[in-house]
């Protein structure tokens, strides 16, 4: 039996006692032998940054509420936890703190594990792992070597952001105003060998699979559809001539708008395109531009916003219909890694080409018009002013200035051109995808070593499976430049597994999205010799996955792709890794600042600020507690270090207890919406917890309750019992179907308030109160499990795991009312109410409605034409 001080709610004592009980009984450790239906629920695993933030608390509390509820409704529930432990932040911390990334990472894991345990999550800790351990990453190394043999993993050159000072590749977000975020060096675009996985081989399946994911938010599925970007078009060949008219390798371009082909006035190629490099050999000015463009962005987002730049190469492309020669230009908005690295430019019907052509004085030709213009503006075409209809394929279009294709619509032109090019061998119909193969190489140390050996004779050779894992050395000296394994000859140098000759290991490591793409399956069998074992098919697909919508594209796309790789390797049977996805909103908070001397802002933590209000409670200002002087109110924004508006979960748990923090994080907003952190709201939740504690202890202090006798209840007792069972029904629906935890809490609060006004001290009055209090404790258990654990004992039910106690079921008979209150309307306007027996006859209801004093006044002098009764709700008297 736990020792809890009666009458006084001490959250820390209550929570320590409950957690000790759960640990001693291994309450949340599960296996696959249960006859109960399985439910696999988890949140996206955290990066061990050193401390939890409120976003973590909200995320993990959501999944914990669902997990505990599912246990109480008879499910065998798995809720695991692990650590996404590789990545750049550990390298940065190693430099800053002069320590090895591994040491920093493992210390953070220990600290954050303790924080998670203090919040009382129902986690099966026996399945915990960190992705930076060889026991974990050996399996993705083995999978990679198998993918190499199947041709699904391959190596080719790719353009990356290169920091020449730090000697490393930078992610796009690490390039700030063209410079490395840490070194400040001007970033170059460099082409280096990279390993890729052929996710494009699965593009159509990834797209089609979205239609089966009924439990995923439409917003996420739309983002994935757009990212995959399926488009149908033609691939067309343009012959190329140099300045002397000699033939060069032809260009192949893909277009979804072959109907605009006669509007091509130039062809654009990427700065890295072989034809651009060829032309630059005899054109110093072009060579200088190509060198400059090395410092530009490599992402599509950057290319959309940067200034359009380019130069004529001196080469020409032969128009495949007219035979005219059009110039070939280098353009900084064409990506070598996307499509063929060349696009046909139709400035009359593509806004990007239009802007480029106007800048450089290139011809602009109209070749499409609207068949049914809606106004005069849509009848005019102006080569100097862009209008959206120029490129609107959703409208009925007609070709003009297109020789024999004049008068055709889009579909007719598409078919005619496709037939012509396929017949002449100049092109073909093709489905294209915006999705590109997944580049998995990272020029970093703190990651999983790529299991490849480079031999001068044999080339790239996968490390034999019996030599795996290739272990990353953890005890290293870490500096700002390069990677420790690149400079360690004892690690790097090895022998070729094929010929036995001297060779070198790959010193790149995997993209950390590799580890997070299959961890959900590993939780099912964390000690399996292979990547997973048969237990994976018991648990997979996971039933609920909780995480932020910011992961909609990269993580969730790779996650789905890798699961299909595992399926095709016969490791799992399911097509998709997760059935239902819940994307929780951000945690936001007030921001405060003072103007800095350098023109910037000094952000001040909300905990250091006192809000000033007028007599109506409206905010009038804020002052810094330390000096009493005013600070500016910056509005509410996502909690972040940059705005210094984060709230430390540990300090909140220390001040209020874990249950109160959990309760507020679920009450303040629906899961999908942003949660505004407000300590006044946390205070309100703390008051509710104390009130509930006092209600239970006051009831128990008055003696044991007798057995409930439903037949002997008074009308008031029945009303309270009805409220109890209405609440049970609503909370069950809110937890199980709607995931609307805030309204579930509100319903329990309403019941608590109703119970506080119920002062019936009779035997059956106390029996009704006992039933209501037991229901409240169980209904709140998924959210406030520590207090529920204690109060269940106070109510005389003994110390037990409440997750093994059945979730309350609404008694339908308790919902039946003996009497009903009906609204009385005269000609649709409310004039009064009447109380009638639930089984009252129609004639009796009509008579009572007409006799209601206020209704009778309005009926005076009128004749009743019709009486409409909506059962249980309204009596509408139509009179005239």
Curated annotation (Swiss-Prot):
Motif stretch ('HIGH' region): 46-56
Uppermost EC category: ligase
Keyword Nucleotide-binding: yes
Cellular compartment(s): Cytoplasm
GO biological process, one term: leucyl-tRNA aminoacylation
Taxonomic superkingdom: Bacteria
Keywords assigned by UniProt, alphabetized: Aminoacyl-tRNA synthetase, ATP-binding, Cytoplasm, Ligase, Nucleotide-binding, Protein biosynthesis
Catalytic activity as recorded in UniProt: tRNA(Leu) + L-leucine + ATP = L-leucyl-tRNA(Leu) + AMP + diphosphate
Keyword Aminoacyl-tRNA synthetase: yes
Renumbered ranges of motif 'KMSKS' region: 638-642
Family statement drawn from the similarity comment of this UniProt entry: Belongs to the class-I aminoacyl-tRNA synthetase family.
NCBIfam families hit by this protein: leuS_bact
PANTHER family linked to this entry: LEUCINE--TRNA LIGASE, MITOCHONDRIAL, LEUCYL-TRNA SYNTHETASE
Protein name stated in the entry: Leucine--tRNA ligase
Organism this protein belongs to: Xanthomonas oryzae pv. oryzae (strain MAFF 311018)
Gene: leuS
């Amino acid at each position: 039996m736990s020792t809890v001080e009666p009458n006084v709610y001490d959250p820390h004592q209550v929570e320590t006692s409950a957690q000790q009980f759960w640990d001693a009984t291994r309450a949340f450790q599960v296996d696959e032998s249960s006859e109960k239906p399985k439910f696999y629920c988890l949140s996206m695993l955290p990066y061990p940054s050193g401390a939890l933030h409120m976003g973590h608390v909200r995320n993990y509390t959501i999944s914990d509420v669902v997990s505990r509820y599912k246990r109480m409704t008879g499910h065998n529930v798995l809720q695991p936890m692990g650590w996404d432990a590789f990545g750049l932040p550990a390298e940065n911390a190693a430099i800053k703190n002069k320590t090895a990334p591994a040491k920093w990472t493992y210390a953070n894991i220990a600290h954050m594990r303790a924080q998670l345990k203090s919040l009382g999550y129902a986690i099966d800790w026996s399945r915990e792992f960190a992705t930076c351990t060889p026991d974990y990453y050996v399996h993705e190394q083995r999978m990679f070597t198998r993918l190499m043999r199947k041709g699904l993993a391959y190596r080719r050159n790719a353009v990356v952001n290169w920091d020449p000072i730090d000697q490393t590749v930078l992610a796009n977000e690490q390039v700030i105003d063209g410079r490395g975020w840490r070194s400040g060096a001007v970033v170059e675009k460099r082409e280096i060998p990279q390993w890729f996985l052929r996710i494009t081989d699965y593009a159509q399946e990834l797209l089609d699979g979205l239609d089966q994911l009924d439990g995923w938010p439409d917003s996420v599925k739309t983002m994935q559809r757009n990212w995959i970007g399926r488009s149908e078009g033609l691939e067309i060949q343009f012959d190329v001539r140099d300045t002397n008219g000699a033939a060069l390798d032809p260009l192949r371009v893909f277009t979804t708008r072959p109907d605009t082909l006669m509007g091509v006035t130039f062809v654009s190629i990427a700065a890295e395109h072989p034809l651009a490099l060829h032309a630059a050999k005899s054109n110093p000015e072009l060579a200088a531009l190509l060198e400059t463009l090395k410092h530009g962005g490599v992402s599509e987002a950057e290319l959309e916003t940067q200034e359009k730049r380019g130069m004529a190469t001196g080469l020409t492309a032969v128009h495949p219909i007219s035979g005219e020669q059009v110039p070939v230009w280098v353009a900084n908005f064409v990506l070598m890694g996307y499509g063929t690295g060349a696009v046909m430019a139709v400035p009359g019907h593509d806004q990007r080409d239009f802007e480029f052509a106007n800048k450089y004085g290139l011809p602009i030709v109209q070749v499409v018009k609207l068949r049914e213009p809606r106004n005069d503006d849509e009848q005019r075409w102006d080569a100097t002013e862009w209008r959206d209809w120029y490129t609107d394929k959703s409208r009925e279009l007609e070709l003009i200035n297109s020789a024999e294709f004049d008068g055709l619509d889009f579909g007719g032109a598409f078919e005619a051109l496709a037939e012509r090019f396929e017949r002449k061998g100049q092109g073909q119909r093709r489905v294209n995808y915006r999705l590109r193969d997944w580049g998995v190489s990272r020029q970093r140390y703190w990651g999983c070593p790529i299991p490849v050996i480079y031999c001068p004779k044999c080339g790239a050779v996968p490390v034999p499976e019996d030599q795996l894992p290739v272990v990353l050395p953890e005890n290293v000296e870490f500096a700002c430049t390069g990677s420790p394994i690149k400079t360690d000859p004892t690690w790097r140098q090895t022998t070729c597994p094929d010929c036995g000759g001297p060779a070198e290991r790959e010193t790149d490591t995997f993209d950390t999205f590799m580890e997070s793409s299959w961890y959900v399956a590993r939780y099912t069998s964390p000690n399996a010799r292979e990547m997973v074992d048969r237990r994976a098919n018991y648990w997979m697909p996971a039933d609920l996955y909780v995480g932020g919508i910011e992961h909609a594209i990269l993580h969730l796309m790779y996650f789905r792709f890798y699961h299909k790789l595992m399926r095709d390797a016969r490791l799992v049977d399911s097509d998709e890794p997760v059935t239902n996805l819940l994307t929780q909103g951000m945690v936001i908070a007030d921001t405060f600042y003072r103007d800095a001397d350098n023109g910037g802002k000094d952000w001040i933590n909300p905990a250091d600020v006192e809000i000033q209000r007028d007599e109506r409670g409206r905010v009038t200002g804020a002052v810094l507690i330390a000096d009493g002087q005013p600070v500016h109110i910056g509005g509410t924004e996502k909690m972040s270090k940059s705005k210094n508006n984060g709230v430390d979960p540990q300090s909140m748990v220390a001040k209020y207890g874990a249950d109160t923090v959990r309760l507020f994080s679920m009450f303040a907003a629906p899961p999908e919406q942003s949660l505004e952190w407000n300590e006044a709201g946390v205070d309100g939740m703390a008051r509710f917890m104390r009130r509930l504690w006092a209600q239970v202890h006051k009831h128990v202090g008055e003696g044991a309750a007798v057995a409930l006798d439903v037949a002997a209840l008074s009308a008031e007792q029945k009303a309270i019992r009805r409220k109890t069972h209405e609440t049970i029904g609503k909370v069950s629906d809110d937890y199980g179907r709607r995931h609307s935890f805030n309204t579930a809490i509100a319903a329990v609060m309403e019941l608590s308030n109703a119970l506080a006004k119920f002062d019936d001290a009779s035997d059956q009055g106390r029996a009704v109160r006992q039933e209501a209090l037991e229901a409240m404790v169980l209904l709140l258990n998924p959210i406030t499990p520590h207090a529920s654990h204690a109060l269940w004992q106070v109510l005389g039910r003994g110390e037990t795991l409440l997750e093994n106690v059945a979730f309350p079921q609404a008694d339908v008979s308790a919902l039946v009312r003996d009497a009903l209150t009906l609204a009385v309307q005269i000609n649709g306007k409310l004039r009064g109410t009447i109380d009638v027996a639930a089984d009252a006859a129609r004639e009796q209801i009509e008579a009572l409605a007409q006799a209601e004093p206020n209704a009778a006044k309005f009926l005076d002098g009128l004749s009743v034409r019709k009486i409409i009764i909506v059962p249980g709700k309204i009596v509408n008297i139509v009179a005239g």
